[in-house]
Each structure stands twice: as C-alpha cells, then as structure tokens.
C-alpha cells in the first residue's frame, strides 16, 4: 500500500512536469509567433514587400549563406550575398554554413587581415571595415526567429554625412555608380547605412538615389532581433573618388585617379533631374558670378566690396548663395548656370561639380594656408572632361585676418595648448604639411576670417581668365583613342655585305574613318632581337623604309601604333618579326 502511494505520487509529479513543460512550450511558441507577426507587421510598412516566410526559413536553415565577391583585396572588394544575416543584439553580421553555402574568396584567417572589405570609400580606414561571424545553420534553432528582408539591399557606410564634400565624394557618387555596376540594382535596391550616424544634414540627397527609403542601423532594431537579407550587396566602388584625406600621408589627389568629367557630369545630370532643376534655365535671366557666403566661420569680412569689384571688373551681375539660407535645389540651380563660382575653401565648393563647362572656380584660402597642400576642389575642377578653369588665391597679409583663439579646439581654438605652442602658432607664416584630422595649427588657421585683398585677387583671376568668364557651348568632351593599325607588314632586302633595308607598312585603324581628328601620327619601335633597347620613330605616313643601322642577316622586332592629337596613344599592333 505504501509503495503504491509512492508510485502514484511519482506518476502524478511526472505528468504534472510534462504538462507544465508542454504548456510552457505552447506559450513560448505563441510568443514567438506573436513576435514574428509583430515584426512582420512593422517590417511590411517600411519595406513594402512580403516574403514567403516558411520557404525562406527552410532555404536558410538547409542551404545557409552564399557569398561571391569581386576584387582582389579588401580595399577594392564588393560582395554579393544571399541569406546574409545581422544580429541587432550583437551588432554583427552572420554567415550561416549550410548544405549550399559558398564563400568566395575563401580566405580563412586572412579575412581578418585586416578585413573582408571596406564598407566606405575611404580606403583602409580601421573604423570602416566589414566582416562577419560564422555559425552552423543548425544554430538558428536556438536563436531569435529571423525576420527576412525582402528587398535587395546595398549595405555600406557613410563616412561623414554632415559634411557636403564627404557626402558627394565619399557617398553619393560611389553609391550612384555601384548601383549601376550590377543589372537592375538601381531600380530595386534599398540602401542600408551601417556606420551608426543619424540622418545628418543632407539625408534628402541620399533619398534621390533609390526609389526606396534608405534605412539606418538604429532603425534595424525596430524590425527584429535577427534580420536576414534574401539578397544583399556589401561595399562600394571607389572608382569615382579622386582625393585622399591624409590619414596615412598628407592629404592630396589619389595616386591613380580613374574618373573623368564625363562620369561626374552623368551623375550631376541625374541629380539635377531628381531635384527638378534640370530644365529650369538661367534663374536670373543673364550671366552672373556666384559668391558663396559663409555665416558662421571662415567669413569674407569685406564681402560687399568683393561683390562690387567683381561686378565692375567683369561687367557681370554678382549674387550670393549660402547653404544656410537656400535649399540645396536652389543652390544647384544657381551654380549650374553660373559663369564663375567664388568661395572660401570649404565643403560647399564640391558644388562646383554642377558648374557648366567653361565656368571658373575661384577658391580663397585664409592666411598661412598653402593652396598647394589642400586641393580637393582643384583636383575636381581639373579632371579631364570637366572643362573648368581653376584659380587659387591666398591671403598673404597677416593684418587682413581675424583669428579666434578662444573658440573650442574643433573650431580653431588654441587656448588649451601651452603658451609656447600658442605663441609658435600665432607667429607661424604657413601651416606645415600634416596628417588628418586634429592638427591645432591647421584648425586655427582654417577657421580664420579674411579681408580679401581685392587687387591681388583680381590679378590671380586674370592670370587664368583672359576674357569674359562664362560657359562654353557644349562640345564632345570625351577623348577617343585610336584602335590598332591593321595589316602591318615588313619586307627586307640586303644591299651587299654591309647594308640592308627594312620596309614597314600598315593600314589606318578602322575607327579613324569615323572620327574627326586634327593630327594623326604613327610611332614605330625597332628592336634588334636579343637586345634590350629599341629605337623609336615618329612618322606621318603609313609606310617607311629604314636604312640607318639596319644590319644584313639580322632579325628585328617591329611594333607600330597610332597616335591622335599628340597625346592619345593607341595600342601597339602585334609584333612583326622581320629578318634581313
């Protein structure tokens, strides 16, 4: 009787435990379903698309993540993912290994030396690296239910969304061409910015690039604890960038610039259309000079006098514009029809990319700031095909500057420095070359206000602008190169024991008959087989007989190429092997 009671008590306890666990599992399942429903409800209004959830979950749990990248190193790599996931709790991306997972390149531990790729276009910056954590797909059973992002995603970092130069150079231009690097991406993609900034002052410009609202990292938390992208591209093309900011060596143009004015102007045409200013015409009904007015720092102290003198010198209307008092669309409308743009050095000068061909950029530099050391806008203006004139003016008169040593350090203040360093900076006549970004002497000088010396400024402008400034009638701005010469032949003859002739002929490149070219020449290289040096010849005809230094019973290698207008060098035709 005693054993039976004990057995019954144990049985009741086990059944109660099983029932309790069953109830808890049902409650947990109901909670997960509720969370998923809520997550999907919050996701749908933002993303606007739906996905077959059971099918997507099955693909992810069985197949895992798939990655294929282009580019040889982390600085030029863009990766295409299927089923890449992101944990909002860990703030890390996840690669789930399943039966169909692919990881190309499969770098092993080299993926951390230093990263898989750069998320921004600022090359090899340690705050801009992208990587992921690896997990088996089976781990999904123990993780929060994934919320699937149905949109094609382009995932990247903005570098500094409050600075207009960085917005255009580092973000908008690269985004524009990355979206066009892969078919259909420009029409389908949603931009995901993962650097952690807020919207910033120019977020409306990012919205112009895609028909879908961009999302910030902070907004992802509202979508779910674990997000999985059905299709994502990660990284940005750096091919349109022209400037490096001085993190490793003092700032300056990139060593290998790959963008021309043609690509810049294709981008600005798109932007002006999206801003609804492309067909507005000249806003003032006449030619004018546009002066950027700054309202907080780096002021032009005699701005009214400058406007008057520019108007008198060039017999043109002068107007001012500022980022603070004008919408960006109005700024673009004014810049895109201006004959000349005058501004203190600063981010607003990146709007020069909207200037018409033939216009002039005049960049003003405060006292002790060498224009040759800070050239992002000069580099932009002088890109092949931009067809802009560029003038740099520097204040050389100490008395014409007003400094602000009492301001905070990030606005040029120096009172936090010791007295000796303050005295040195105050007496310095030129800021030495330096790295980015907190050099106190640079900040002190670049935030000065300036009284522009009008005569020296006019002299600087007149050295570049000989006549009346203004846009030129649009012309074909792309430099077209010759193709290979065709049907290259050689014929040799021996004149006795010591003399020989080598006759070489060819036909014009086939694309020449479709082009208008001012000057056509041909370059011929002759090299005796076995020698390390060659002899170049520049010719105007399509055949030539060489006699000087041509030896009997000798083999020569001959290369021929066409040159347009002295500087457009075509490819060499296949080498000719000629024996005398």
UniProtKB/Swiss-Prot annotation:
Protein name: Protein O-linked-mannose beta-1,4-N-acetylglucosaminyltransferase 2
Biological process annotations from GO: neuron migration; protein O-linked glycosylation; protein O-linked mannosylation
Lumenal side: 26-580
Alphabetized GO MF terms: acetylglucosaminyltransferase activity; protein O-acetylglucosaminyltransferase activity
Tissue specificity note: Mainly expressed in the central nervous system.
Organism of provenance: Mus musculus (Mouse)
Catalysis: reaction(s): 3-O-(alpha-D-mannosyl)-L-threonyl-[protein] + UDP-N-acetyl-alpha-D-glucosamine = 3-O-(N-acetyl-beta-D-glucosaminyl-(1->4)-alpha-D-mannosyl)-L-threonyl-[protein] + UDP + H(+)
SUPFAM superfamilies the UniProt entry points to: Fibronectin type III
Segments on the Cytoplasmic side according to the record's topology features: 1-4
Residue span(s) of domain Fibronectin type-III: 488-580
Described function: O-linked mannose beta-1,4-N-acetylglucosaminyltransferase that transfers UDP-N-acetyl-D-glucosamine to the 4-position of the mannose to generate N-acetyl-D-glucosamine-beta-1,4-O-D-mannosylprotein. Involved in the biosynthesis of the phosphorylated O-mannosyl trisaccharide (N-acetylgalactosamine-beta-3-N-acetylglucosamine-beta-4-(phosphate-6-)mannose), a carbohydrate structure present in alpha-dystroglycan (DAG1), which is required for binding laminin G-like domain-containing extracellular proteins with high affinity.
Disulfide-bond pairs as recorded: none
Catalytic activity, EC: 2.4.1.312
Protein localization: Endoplasmic reticulum membrane
PROSITE patterns: FN3
Family: Belongs to the glycosyltransferase 61 family.
Disruption phenotype: Newborns are slightly smaller and die within the first day of birth due to abnormal basal lamina formation and neuronal migration defects. Defects are due to a lack of laminin-binding glycans.
Bilayer-crossing regions: 5-25
This protein's pathway: Protein modification; protein glycosylation
GO cellular component labels: endoplasmic reticulum; endoplasmic reticulum membrane
